[in-house]
A protein has these predicted regions:
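Domain-level signal for soluble alpha/beta catalytic cores
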Residues: 1-334
Length: 334
């Protein structure tokens, strides 16, 4: 099969293999320990989330990751958004659609994005990174997608079916995308794990993604985990710049990619190549062999190496080793 050369002017990541993460880490919120922290806590200035974000940023940089996230410290990927979106109710870890979904009046995760950016900027200086190294770095926003949010929620009133709710949810989330672009995010990753389940009308899902990406100059990505056999040909046509999928924990997906790589023309591929569902260090030789298949399919300049999914359920020492495998292989192939 001939190697496809992709061109997308929006994605200026360089012609080399880069590394990123998909989302969360298992870093727990911490109670104030030092005297200074306790004083801040007593006057309402202690922010445990900032501590977790800082720890997550440093962890990723220690492991050589290029495009980092904030660690998603606020928990549930659905609840962390719907708590702030009019039309949703969130109680007992359950999301319910109770009225028409409307755009929030405030940003949701942009504060965390900006704090992660500020930590990254300081660390670039502290670590004495070269100009070339610093150019590769950046923070992306992880945004739970409208199809996943609505399919994770119970319909209680107003909507008789989910599809109109998905479209309204996309309009509600559009503000977050625009704010991320203004804040200088490296890109936005829309998390849509439900797209591989067969439960979602993919035409509606595509329309919702178009609402989020239309007119945005910043690169836009979409993460879809699970078995791609029944959805890859459709999701490869979504109006995104980066399609991120799992290939380590699912032995079907690499064959699906190899058979359909031509559909990714104009896109980059987020290549999940360490297993986020297993709390053990991956075999580096097996990961390397998998990455080599990905490179043969789409070319290293079109790939971002990352875990299959978030690493919240993986012990931190093991998560670090998984990420080190990614950065070691990126250096080797570059």
């Amino acid at each position: 099969m001939a190697l496809i050369r992709f061109v997308n002017e929006k994605i200026n990541f360089g012609d080399y293999l880069i590394t990123t993460v998909v989302g969360s880490f298992g870093i727990d919120l911490k109670e104030p320990e030092t005297l200074g922290e306790k004083i801040k806590s007593s006057i309402g200035l202690y922010d445990p989330y900032k501590i977790v974000i800082e720890e997550a940023v440093k962890l990723q940089l220690d492991c050589g990751i290029d495009i980092i996230g904030d660690g998603q410290p606020r928990g549930d990927m659905v609840g962390s958004f719907v708590k702030h979106i009019p039309g949703f109710s969130y109680e007992m870890n359950s999301s319910v659609i109770v009225s028409k979904i409307r755009a929030p009046q405030v940003d949701i995760m942009i504060k965390d994005l900006k704090y992660a950016q500020s930590v990254l900027k300081k660390e670039i200086g502290y670590r004495g990174m070269s100009e070339d190294e610093a150019k590769k770095k950046g923070v992306k926003l992880m945004l739970t997608g409208p199809s996943t949010i609505v399919h994770s929620s119970r319909l209680e009133s107003f909507y008789k079916e989910r599809n109109p709710a998905i479209i309204d949810c996309a309009h509600a989330l559009r503000r977050e995308v625009e704010s991320a672009e203004k804040a200088g995010a490296k890109y936005v990753q829309i998390d849509e794990p439900f797209l591989s389940t067969g439960m979602v009308d993919l035409k509606v899902a595509k329309e919702a993604i178009e609402i989020l990406t239309d007119g945005i100059e910043m690169p836009m990505g979409m993460h879809v985990c699970g078995n791609l056999d029944g959805c890859f040909k459709d999701i490869a046509k979504f109006p995104i710049d980066i399609l991120d999928c799992e290939f380590a924990g699912n032995n079907v997906n690499i064959g699906v990619l190899e058979a359909n790589a031509d559909l990714l023309k104009g896109k980059k591929l987020g290549f999940g190549c360490v297993d986020s569902a297993v709390n053990a260090v991956d075999d580096k030789d097996e990961v390397k062999a998998l990455v080599e298949r990905g490179i043969r399919a789409v070319g290293k300049e079109n790939m971002l190496l990352d875990p299959d999914c978030g690493l919240r359920k993986v012990d931190i020492p093991i998560a670090k080793e998984k990420l080190m495998i990614l950065s070691d292989l990126a250096k080797e192939f570059n």
